[in-house]
């Protein structure tokens, strides 16, 4: 049975680790150090660590793997056939990349070379793509630049959020990894060099990424709202209060007045002008409050027509 060392941290990595445990001999799991979570700021394990502990697999949590001689020596001792990396959150040194018998394989949630970087799922939706997918590749020292192995294409539906796409790619990625390891270990996959990307780098998201510019077209605003749901969420300023926008629709209507102007509020939502039409905001959240459908929110609170969202 093939020996595997797995490296990953967030929820996206979990189905991959579970599939690897089902199919191979997973000797060790590396994940990021426990982080303070919630109001009590108690240290919490990563989702990946929880799975490893449940399956009695040794866990290592180096702050910086490339500087951790002890962990690197342990990996050399294990002498894995493959190191498999899914959203680990650290760049691997050449010393680590050279450890496995076959290769270090990475699962990346885009059709490489497009959308290299930390947030490929979000940027594919923000940019209005209709297709994306997963790519497995042999890891090189650069970020997401290694030779490609297998791809799996996925359609992005018109109303799909980043959260929904994340879950599809997360589950399909696990199957693609197993297929990649099986075929690669038998010599059935010819690695393919990456060409030049046709898209921008998929940079890490920050809360500022979500600020809506109402001078943009409706399509652009709608894609931003979908692409940042469930985190960090698109937002606008209503009377100097941050209004996070969870859900919206494009209205088939011409703008009335300047961009950002609220032209109507009712149980269906808040109508707002864009540069070329209108957006209907249907689900919102104000600081310290839970998210609510607009119809529910306006039963106890005011959203005034004529206010300009900034």
UniProtKB/Swiss-Prot annotation:
SUPFAM superfamilies: FMT C-terminal domain-like, Formyltransferase. Keywords: Protein biosynthesis, Transferase. It is an enzyme of class 2 (transferase). InterPro entries: Fmt, Formyl_trans_C, Formyl_transf_N, Formyl_transf_N_sf, Formyl_transferase-like_C_sf, Met-tRNA-FMT_C, Met-tRNA-FMT_N. (6S)-5,6,7,8-tetrahydrofolate binds at residues 110-113. Its EC number is 2.1.2.9. Belongs to the Fmt family. Attaches a formyl group to the free amino group of methionyl-tRNA(fMet). The formyl group appears to play a dual role in the initiator identity of N-formylmethionyl-tRNA by promoting its recognition by IF2 and preventing the misappropriation of this tRNA by the elongation apparatus. NCBIfam families: fmt. This is Methionyl-tRNA formyltransferase. It comes from Clostridium acetobutylicum (strain ATCC 824 / DSM 792 / JCM 1419 / IAM 19013 / LMG 5710 / NBRC 13948 / NRRL B-527 / VKM B-1787 / 2291 / W).
């Amino acid at each position: 049975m093939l020996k595997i060392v797995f490296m990953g941290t967030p929820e996206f990595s979990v189905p991959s680790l579970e599939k690897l445990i089902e199919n191979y001999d997973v000797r060790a799991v590396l994940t990021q150090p426990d982080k303070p979570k919630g109001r009590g700021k108690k240290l919490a394990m990563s989702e990946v660590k929880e799975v490893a502990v449940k399956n009695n697999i040794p866990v290592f949590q180096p702050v910086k793997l490339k500087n951790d001689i002890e962990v690197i020596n342990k990996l050399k001792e294990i002498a894995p056939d493959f190191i498999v990396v899914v959203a680990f959150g650290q760049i691997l040194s050449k010393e680590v990349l050279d450890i496995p018998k076959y290769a270090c394989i990475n699962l990346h949630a885009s059709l490489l070379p497009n959308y290299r970087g930390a947030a490929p799922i979000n940027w594919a939706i923000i940019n209005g793509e209709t297709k994306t997918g997963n790519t497995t590749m042999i890891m090189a020292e650069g970020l997401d630049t290694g030779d490609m192995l297998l791809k799996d294409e996925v359609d992005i539906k018109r109303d799909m959020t980043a959260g929904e796409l994340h879950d599809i790619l997360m589950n399909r990625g696990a199957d693609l990894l197993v297929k990649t390891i099986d075929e690669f270990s038998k010599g059935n996959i010819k690695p393919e060099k990456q060409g030049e990307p046709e898209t921008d780098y998929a940079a890490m998201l920050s809360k500022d990424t979500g600020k809506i510019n109402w001078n943009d077209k409706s399509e652009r605003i709608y894609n931003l709202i979908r692409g940042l749901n469930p985190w960090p969420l698109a937002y606008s300023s209503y009377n100097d209060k941050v209004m996070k926008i969870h859900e919206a629709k494009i209205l088939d209507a011409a703008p009335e007045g300047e961009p950002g102007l609220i032209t109507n509020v009712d149980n269906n939502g808040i109508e707002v002008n864009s540069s070329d039409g209108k957006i209907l905001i249907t689900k919102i959240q104000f600081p310290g409050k839970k998210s609510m459908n607009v119809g529910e929110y306006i039963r106890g609170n005011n959203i005034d027509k004529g206010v300009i969202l900034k």
